Amino acid sequence: MDISLDQLWDEALCHLQVQLSRPTFEAWIKTARAESLVDNRLTICTPSEWARGWLQKHYASTITEVVQRVAGIPLQVEFSVSPHASVEAEPPSRAISPTSGRAGSLPASTTLGLEVGGSLPMRAPDLNPKYSFSRFVVGPNNRMAHAAALAVADKPGRAYNPLFLCGGVGLGKTHLMQAIGHYQLEANPQAKVFYVSTERFTNDLIDAIRRDSMQSFREHYRDVDILLVDDVQFIEGKEYTQEEFFHTFNTLHESGKQIVLAADRSPHLIPRLQERLCSRFSMGLIAEIQSPDIETRMAILKKKAEYEGMNLPADVIEYIATTYTSNIRELEGALIRAVAYVSISGLPMSVETIQPILNPPSEPKEITADMITDVVCEEFGIDRDSLLGSSRKRDISQARQIAMFLMRHYTNLSLPKIGDYFGGKDHTTVLYSCEKVSQLQRQSLQFERQLQKLVERLRVVANSRSS
């Protein structure tokens, strides 16, 4: 079935409404309409010459980027004038119809995968069972953040509201945030705890606009006792997302519900963050987590080894802790690599054994999408066409999800660009795949080690091709 011009423009409007401020969208975008699509040339009608000139000058690149992302093919956007455009313009219809009343359609291969009607899926905490207070190692770098998180978990809505955790990648912000959720659910199993990233919030907002279900979206996010929001820095520049989050924040805060936020920097350092949001993020407690010192790193490795049933000599722990100093994720990754290597090689666990594979981290070589494709295909024994195609066979589907996950985390490709690489898949499909792999990573140590093995092979390939 062909995708109609109406459907393309409606979907684009949903994305533009999230990206732009409400006044901008209402004044300039909502009054325009897609007139025709001929030879990959999309014509957009505006109600006046002034509006046409303004869109062309200020928003042409944004509109072009969005419609190409939605269509999955290169499009050229042109603006024309129609005095009836503002009269006929309507908000996105959301309903999906097989035919269009206007000229032009997209090939069936660019199907958008939209759902008709419905509401957001039932909320679930989605907390990693490993992220508890009992498994969190306290040190000088995180003592204040840990104490604040405990206070919030014990008395949500009364201690520090909001609690804003900030610090670099892999320092334990997500661990502490989810530990609050676990603590509260153990104390009160009926508590409504919701953990979400700002990226997920934005995508849910786009879906709500698309389905005309904003009321359901608001109930979904505002009917909670504790809202845990990760990666807040990604809200920067998203005007409508910030506006919706502002009202969600106010509703929860005024109701005495607990809000916990995490970002890689403090609120006032997040660029293009609305001043009113920055003010609210700062009205509770901002707790910074810094890189762990040598004693804390050694304690983290000991606890990790203890929980995973690993027997590590003291000098091995000291060597890893001395070699990897920047963050906990890197530290634990080194431990997993060392254990995997010893298990595969049959050699004894010693500094001499693991030293060759745990050299001090150097400047990483660029990993490309093609490298990831080659390594994943080799690992799973499948061909490139199958991986990049649409086969739903379980082994191919999982390999594809892993490849998408690796591209998201080890390349600079955006979600839409990754979708394009896999034959024009929607960015929500890519996001789902990444979340699925993250979930498997949390649930299975064996899967986590397999993933780490793939990453190591990627680094070897990247280094060999750059030398």
Curated annotation (Swiss-Prot):
Single Gene Ontology BP annotation: regulation of DNA replication
Comp. bias intervals (Polar residues): 96-108
Disulphide-bridged cysteine pairs: none
PROSITE patterns attached to this UniProt entry: DNAA (PS01008)
Region (Disordered): 89-108
Region (Domain III, AAA+ region): 126-342
Keywords (A to Z) from UniProt: ATP-binding, Cytoplasm, DNA replication, DNA-binding, Lipid-binding, Nucleotide-binding
Transmembrane segments: none
Annotated residues for binding of ATP: G170, G172, K173, T174
Positions of the UniProt region annotated as Domain IV, binds dsDNA: 343-467
Cellular localization per UniProt: Cytoplasm
CDD domains found in the cross-reference section: AAA (cd00009), Bac_DnaA_C (cd06571)
GO molecular function annotation: ATP binding; ATP hydrolysis activity; DNA replication origin binding; lipid binding
Record Pfam families: Bac_DnaA, Bac_DnaA_C, DnaA_N
Region described as Domain II: 84-125
Principal location class: cytoplasm
Cellular-component GO terms for this entry: cytoplasm; plasma membrane
Function field: Plays an essential role in the initiation and regulation of chromosomal replication. ATP-DnaA binds to the origin of replication (oriC) to initiate formation of the DNA replication initiation complex once per cell cycle. Binds the DnaA box (a 9 base pair repeat at the origin) and separates the double-stranded (ds)DNA. Forms a right-handed helical filament on oriC DNA; dsDNA binds to the exterior of the filament while single-stranded (ss)DNA is stabiized in the filament's interior.
PANTHER family reported for this sequence: CHROMOSOMAL REPLICATION INITIATOR PROTEIN DNAA (PTHR30050:SF2)
NCBIfam families named among the record's database cross-references: DnaA
Subunit structure: Oligomerizes as a right-handed, spiral filament on DNA at oriC.
Family named by the database record: Belongs to the DnaA family.
Domain comment quoted from the record: Domain I is involved in oligomerization and binding regulators, domain II is flexibile and of varying length in different bacteria, domain III forms the AAA+ region, while domain IV binds dsDNA.
HAMAP family, A to Z: DnaA_bact
Protein name: Chromosomal replication initiator protein DnaA
